[in-house]
């Protein structure tokens, strides 16, 4: 053994020579691969330059795509197999050369050790080459012509070419790029194609959602209600189905729907599913500028100070008209007014025995110089002027006369002119036909009763009455059920109490229709006491009637109250919701060009270290500019100081 060792050392052979030689062989192989790759890259660059030089006269970009496609269309498996076979032949030659060069070292080397090491080396190099080839194929760019007309703009990546937008010829991987959305610390992950279904929404529009992008974490951050976002994301995943979570209040979820800009149609459909009727409010304005100003002046009191003043005058006139309508029914005013109307109608024969009739007749009192008539005339003049002006300036005559408020205006004005025409006709008749005059007098009283509808004119200037009207209109289904239940209960219990009290001679229920009043009063828990059962059977029926009335009324009332709360909160918080939506901004310290860069990024993670360092440098430059600006101002506000301190904190995090 010692002789073998001496002979080995004398021949210059090291016992560890196979491992050292393997390291040298590995280094030479890497050098050879580097030279071969450099030569291949130079060949590709030369071919590309030649193609670009020949394609300048026409169809250059198209020819470039074809050449690139030709490079990518060769068989990668065949090229890898041929390279592997060449390497194996080269390694066999090298192994044979080493065995012939070191004949004395063959006894010292383990059998097959060098061949095993070279085989491992070749396998590692093959793996590295395959990974590099896959990366080369991953960077391949497909043109729109390669994929036909099926390529849409939603399948292309946005790019920043200095012109403010556009799309590059890079396709998404079948639109399966993933995006991370952070809602108040709760992370959601979805695909880009899911959001692209609704490009008009906040999440579907790349331009809109860019302001909420956080490049440090490569995600979109929204400081919004977390439970609501489950339904918002499901809206995109389901293709347009919007369902409110059970644990989210209606008004909060409505705010979230408006913030994410799902659209008015989606909001109306959601409200219909919740049980609210679709509102048909015409907010159109006249095209003529003069008519537009008049329309705003009389229709929208909140539009300007003069419009508010006109609204106040209109409310005062309505109140005066209602007060006059009530005061003229007092006994001391009613007698004189009836006598005046009778004298105006020519009814002298009916007033001969009345002591006040000669006094009124001699004093010259007529209906035209009555104080109530004069005040009412002034009110009617204002109502007529307001109605004519609004009719002149309205955007659409058809919609104007279909509006319920305008119909109320007409109904409140017409009785005055009918009364005036009737009085003039009776004066010209000269008092003939007392029966006809009495009938006209009764008709005038009924017409004067219609003037009570003027109180509904206040709803034009009262938010509370408008909310009540919207509530009743939205609760028509529940009100119909309530009336139907009451109708059934009235019929059932009035019949029962009639037959229960049939044998009692002193009963108050002479017939079933007579018992209707008692059943209604009992079911509504009013109980006037004018009609009551006497027998034991009648009292049992009355008890059941009261219990059934309580249950019948209690069932639909919560829905009506819920509708009222919704309309009340919507009217009082509409402006606050708009301000919250408009004031939602993104991080102010990120430069716009940096956001555009990350918006055009094709990866859902930072990945490349150079991109991360470039992003870090851009953020620092922006923060340094903010800091210098803060330090340069001697009288900065408290908000600026806080912003500067926040800038330093963000810079430290970066």
Curated annotation (Swiss-Prot):
Residues 1-305, 394-404, 462-476, 569-654 are cytoplasmic. Residues 122-137 have a biased composition (Acidic residues). Glycans are attached at residue 353. Residues 24-145, 630-654 are annotated as: Disordered. The keyword Ion transport applies. It is a multi-pass membrane protein. Residues 81-99 have a biased composition (Basic residues). Residues 513-524, 525-532 dip into the membrane without crossing it. A motif (PDZ-binding) lies at residues 652-654. Residues 36-50 have a biased composition (Low complexity). Keywords: Cell membrane, Cell projection, Glycoprotein, Ion channel, Ion transport, Membrane, Phosphoprotein, Potassium, Potassium channel, Potassium transport, Transmembrane, Transmembrane helix, Transport, Voltage-gated channel. It is found in: Cell membrane; Cell projection, Axon. Expressed in the brain, lens and retina. The chain crosses the membrane at residues 306-327, 372-393, 405-425, 441-461, 477-498, 540-568. One of its GO terms (cellular component) is plasma membrane. Residues 328-371, 426-440, 499-512, 533-539 are extracellular. It catalyses: K(+)(in) = K(+)(out). Pfam families: BTB_2, Ion_trans, K_channel_TID. The keyword Magnesium does not apply. Residues 463-476 are annotated as: S4-S5 linker. Belongs to the potassium channel family. A (Shaker) (TC 1.A.1.2) subfamily. Kv1.4/KCNA4 sub-subfamily. Voltage-gated potassium channel that mediates transmembrane potassium transport in excitable membranes. Forms tetrameric potassium-selective channels through which potassium ions pass in accordance with their electrochemical gradient. The channel alternates between opened and closed conformations in response to the voltage difference across the membrane. The N-terminus may be important in determining the rate of inactivation of the channel while the tail may play a role in modulation of channel activity and/or targeting of the channel to specific subcellular compartments. The transmembrane segment S4 functions as a voltage-sensor and is characterized by a series of positively charged amino acids at every third position. Channel opening and closing is effected by a conformation change that affects the position and orientation of the voltage-sensor paddle formed by S3 and S4 within the membrane. A transmembrane electric field that is positive inside would push the positively charged S4 segment outwards, thereby opening the pore, while a field that is negative inside would pull the S4 segment inwards and close the pore. Homotetramer and heterotetramer of potassium channel proteins. Interacts with KCNAB1 and KCNAB2. Interacts with DLG1, DLG2 and DLG4 via their PDZ domains. Interacts with SIGMAR1. Detected in a complex with KCNA1. Interacts with KCNA2. Part of a complex containing KCNA1, KCNAB1 and LGI1. Interacts (via cytoplasmic N-terminal domain) with KCNRG. This is Potassium voltage-gated channel subfamily A member 4. The gene is Kcna4.
């Amino acid at each position: 053994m010692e002789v073998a060792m001496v002979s080995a050392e004398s021949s210059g052979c090291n016992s560890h020579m196979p491992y050292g030689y393997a390291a040298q062989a590995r280094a030479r192989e890497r050098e050879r691969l580097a030279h071969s790759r450099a030569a291949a890259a130079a060949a590709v660059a030369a071919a590309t330059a030649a193609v670009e030089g020949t394609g300048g006269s026409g169809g250059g970009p198209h020819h470039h795509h074809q050449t690139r496609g030709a490079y990518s269309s060769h068989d990668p498996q065949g090229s890898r197999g041929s390279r592997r076979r060449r390497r194996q032949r080269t390694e066999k030659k090298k192994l044979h050369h080493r065995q012939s060069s070191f004949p004395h070292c063959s006894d010292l080397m383990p059998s097959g050790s060098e061949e095993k090491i070279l085989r491992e080396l070749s396998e590692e190099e093959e793996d590295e080459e395959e990974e590099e080839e896959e990366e080369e194929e991953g960077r391949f760019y497909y043109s729109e012509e390669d994929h036909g007309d099926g390529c849409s703009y939603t399948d292309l990546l946005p790019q920043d070419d200095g012109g403010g937008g556009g799309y590059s010829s890079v396709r998404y991987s079948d639109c399966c790029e993933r995006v991370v959305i952070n809602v108040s610390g709760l992370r959601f992950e979805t695909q880009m194609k899911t959001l692209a279904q609704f490009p008009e929404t906040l999440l579907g529009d790349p331009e809109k959602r860019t302001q909420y992008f956080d490049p440090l974490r490569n995600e979109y951050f929204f400081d919004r209600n977390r439970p609501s976002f489950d339904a918002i994301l499901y809206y995109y995943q389901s293709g347009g189905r919007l369902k409110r979570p059970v644990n989210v209040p209606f008004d909060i979820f409505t705010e979230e729907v408006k913030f994410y800009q799902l659209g008015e149609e989606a909001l109306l459909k959601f409200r219909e599913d919740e049980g609210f009727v679709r509102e048909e409010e015409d907010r159109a304005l006249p095209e003529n500028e003069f008519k537009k100003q008049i329309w705003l002046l009389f229709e929208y009191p909140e539009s300007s100070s003069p419009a508010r003043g006109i609204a106040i005058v209109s409310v005062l006139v309505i109140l005066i008209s209602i007060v006059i309508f009530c005061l003229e029914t007092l006994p001391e005013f009613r007698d004189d007014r009836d006598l005046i109307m009778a004298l105006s109608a020519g009814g002298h024969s009916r007033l001969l025995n009345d002591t006040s009739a000669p006094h009124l007749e001699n004093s010259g009192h007529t209906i035209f110089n009555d104080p109530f008539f004069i005040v009412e005339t002034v009110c009617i003049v204002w109502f007529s002027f307001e109605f004519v002006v609004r009719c002149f300036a309205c955007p659409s005559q058809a919609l104007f006369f279909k509006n319920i408020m305008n119909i109320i205006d007409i109904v409140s004005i017409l009785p005055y002119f009918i009364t005036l025409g009737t009085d003039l006709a009776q004066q010209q008749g000269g008092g003939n036909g007392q029966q006809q005059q009495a009938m006209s007098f009764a008709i005038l009283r009924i017409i004067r009763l219609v003037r009570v509808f003027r109180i509904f004119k206040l709803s034009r200037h009262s938010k509370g009455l408008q909310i009540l009207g919207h509530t009743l209109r939205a609760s028509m289904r529940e009100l119909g059920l309530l009336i139907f239940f009451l109708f059934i209960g009235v019929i059932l219990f009035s019949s029962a109490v009639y037959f229960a009290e049939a044998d009692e001679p002193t009963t108050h229920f002479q017939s079933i229709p007579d018992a209707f009043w008692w059943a209604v009063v009992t079911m509504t828990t009013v109980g006037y006491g004018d009609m009551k059962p006497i027998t034991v059977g009648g009292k049992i029926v009355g008890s059941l009637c009261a219990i059934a009335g309580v249950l019948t009324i209690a069932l639909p009332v919560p829905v009506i109250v819920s509708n009222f709360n919704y309309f009340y909160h919507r009217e009082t918080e509409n402006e606050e919701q708009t301000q919250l939506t408009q004031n939602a901004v993104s991080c102010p310290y990120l430069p716009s060009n940096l956001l555009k860069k990350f918006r055009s990024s094709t990866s859902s993670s930072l990945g490349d270290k150079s991109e991360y360092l470039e992003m870090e440098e851009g953020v620092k430059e922006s923060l340094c500019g903010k800091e210098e600006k803060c330090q340069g101002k001697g009288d900065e506000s408290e908000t600026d100081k806080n912003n500067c301190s926040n800038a330093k904190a963000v810079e430290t995090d970066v």
